[in-house]
Design a protein with these regions (language model features):
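Conserved segment of the thioredoxin-like fold in thiol-based oxidoreductases
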Residues: 55, 60-83
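Local sequence-structure signature of Cys/Sec-based thiol-disulfide redox active-site neighborhoods
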Residues: 18-59, 108
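Thioredoxin-like thiol-disulfide oxidoreductase module
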Residues: 77-100
Protein backbone atom coordinates (compact mmCIF):
# COMPACT_ATOMS: atom_id res chain seq x y z
CA UNK A 1 0.00 0.00 0.00
CA UNK A 2 1.36 3.43 -0.91
CA UNK A 3 1.22 6.13 1.74
CA UNK A 4 0.61 9.59 0.26
CA UNK A 5 3.51 12.03 0.46
CA UNK A 6 1.54 14.44 2.65
CA UNK A 7 1.10 11.69 5.25
CA UNK A 8 4.82 11.00 5.29
CA UNK A 9 5.54 14.70 5.69
CA UNK A 10 3.21 14.89 8.69
CA UNK A 11 4.82 11.77 10.09
CA UNK A 12 8.35 13.12 10.03
CA UNK A 13 7.52 16.70 10.99
CA UNK A 14 5.63 15.56 14.05
CA UNK A 15 8.08 12.81 15.04
CA UNK A 16 10.13 15.22 17.14
CA UNK A 17 7.20 17.00 18.72
CA UNK A 18 6.94 14.85 21.84
CA UNK A 19 9.22 16.62 24.35
CA UNK A 20 7.70 16.76 27.81
CA UNK A 21 6.14 13.68 29.35
CA UNK A 22 4.99 10.86 27.09
CA UNK A 23 3.52 7.50 28.04
CA UNK A 24 4.28 4.77 25.50
CA UNK A 25 1.94 1.85 25.90
CA UNK A 26 -0.48 -0.38 24.04
CA UNK A 27 -4.12 -1.36 24.30
CA UNK A 28 -3.29 -4.17 26.74
CA UNK A 29 -1.58 -1.80 29.22
CA UNK A 30 -4.05 0.99 30.05
CA UNK A 31 -2.86 4.23 31.60
CA UNK A 32 -3.10 4.30 35.39
CA UNK A 33 -2.94 7.18 37.81
CA UNK A 34 -3.90 10.77 37.17
CA UNK A 35 -3.16 12.19 33.76
CA UNK A 36 -2.43 15.92 33.50
CA UNK A 37 -3.15 17.81 30.27
CA UNK A 38 0.56 18.16 29.46
CA UNK A 39 1.08 14.38 29.26
CA UNK A 40 0.88 12.70 25.86
CA UNK A 41 -0.22 9.08 25.54
CA UNK A 42 1.08 7.13 22.55
CA UNK A 43 -0.48 3.73 21.98
CA UNK A 44 2.05 1.78 19.97
CA UNK A 45 -0.57 -0.61 18.61
CA UNK A 46 -2.80 2.24 17.40
CA UNK A 47 -1.73 2.03 13.73
CA UNK A 48 -2.64 -1.66 13.58
CA UNK A 49 -5.97 -1.06 15.30
CA UNK A 50 -6.82 1.88 13.02
CA UNK A 51 -5.96 -0.13 9.91
CA UNK A 52 -8.01 -3.10 11.15
CA UNK A 53 -10.98 -0.78 11.74
CA UNK A 54 -10.59 0.74 8.28
CA UNK A 55 -9.98 -2.39 6.25
CA UNK A 56 -11.57 -5.15 8.30
CA UNK A 57 -10.87 -8.69 7.18
CA UNK A 58 -9.73 -8.83 3.56
CA UNK A 59 -10.42 -11.71 1.22
CA UNK A 60 -7.88 -14.51 0.96
CA UNK A 61 -8.14 -14.13 -2.82
CA UNK A 62 -5.37 -11.63 -3.75
CA UNK A 63 -7.32 -9.97 -6.57
CA UNK A 64 -10.42 -9.59 -4.42
CA UNK A 65 -8.35 -8.32 -1.47
CA UNK A 66 -6.72 -5.72 -3.73
CA UNK A 67 -10.15 -4.58 -4.92
CA UNK A 68 -11.37 -4.30 -1.32
CA UNK A 69 -8.28 -2.34 -0.26
CA UNK A 70 -8.56 0.05 -3.21
CA UNK A 71 -12.21 0.64 -2.36
CA UNK A 72 -11.35 1.48 1.26
CA UNK A 73 -8.51 3.82 0.24
CA UNK A 74 -10.80 5.67 -2.17
CA UNK A 75 -13.52 6.13 0.46
CA UNK A 76 -14.19 9.47 2.19
CA UNK A 77 -13.92 7.73 5.58
CA UNK A 78 -10.34 6.68 4.84
CA UNK A 79 -9.41 10.24 3.86
CA UNK A 80 -10.98 11.56 7.07
CA UNK A 81 -9.01 9.11 9.21
CA UNK A 82 -5.72 9.51 7.33
CA UNK A 83 -4.45 12.22 9.70
CA UNK A 84 -5.11 10.04 12.76
CA UNK A 85 -3.28 7.18 11.09
CA UNK A 86 -0.31 9.43 10.25
CA UNK A 87 -0.22 10.74 13.83
CA UNK A 88 -0.28 7.21 15.25
CA UNK A 89 2.62 6.20 13.01
CA UNK A 90 4.48 9.36 14.10
CA UNK A 91 4.24 8.20 17.71
CA UNK A 92 5.60 4.78 16.81
CA UNK A 93 8.42 6.37 14.80
CA UNK A 94 9.32 8.62 17.73
CA UNK A 95 9.40 5.69 20.16
CA UNK A 96 11.72 3.91 17.73
CA UNK A 97 13.93 7.02 17.38
CA UNK A 98 14.29 7.14 21.17
CA UNK A 99 15.43 3.53 21.18
CA UNK A 100 12.72 2.34 23.57
CA UNK A 101 13.43 -1.28 24.40
CA UNK A 102 10.04 -2.26 25.80
CA UNK A 103 6.74 -0.85 26.91
CA UNK A 104 4.90 0.41 28.79
CA UNK A 105 7.29 3.25 29.44
CA UNK A 106 7.11 6.83 30.62
CA UNK A 107 9.57 9.18 28.93
CA UNK A 108 10.47 12.56 30.40
CA UNK A 109 11.84 15.24 28.06
CA UNK A 110 12.92 12.65 25.47
CA UNK A 111 15.80 11.82 27.84
CA UNK A 112 14.73 9.88 30.91
CA UNK A 113 12.86 6.57 30.57
CA UNK A 114 11.08 4.57 33.25
CA UNK A 115 9.98 1.15 32.03
CA UNK A 116 7.14 -1.02 33.31
CA UNK A 117 4.52 1.56 34.26
CA UNK A 118 1.94 3.89 32.76
CA UNK A 119 1.56 5.87 35.99
CA UNK A 120 3.37 9.20 35.58
CA UNK A 121 3.55 9.90 39.33
CA UNK A 122 5.07 6.47 40.05
CA UNK A 123 7.51 6.89 37.16
CA UNK A 124 8.49 10.35 38.39
CA UNK A 125 9.09 8.97 41.90
CA UNK A 126 11.33 6.19 40.51
CA UNK A 127 13.24 8.66 38.37
CA UNK A 128 13.70 11.12 41.24
CA UNK A 129 14.89 8.33 43.57
CA UNK A 130 17.40 7.16 40.96
CA UNK A 131 18.66 10.71 40.31
CA UNK A 132 19.17 11.33 44.04
CA UNK A 133 21.52 8.33 44.16
CA UNK A 134 23.63 9.62 41.27
CA UNK A 135 26.82 11.57 42.12
Amino acid sequence: MKIPLCSLTILFLSAGAHAGTVIYTDHAHPVTGELSPDVTVTELDAPDRLLAQQFGPLSTNPAQAEQQARSVIASPAFRQNQQALAASYAGVAHAWSLGLEKYPAVVFDDKWVVYGTTDVAAARAKLDAWREKQP
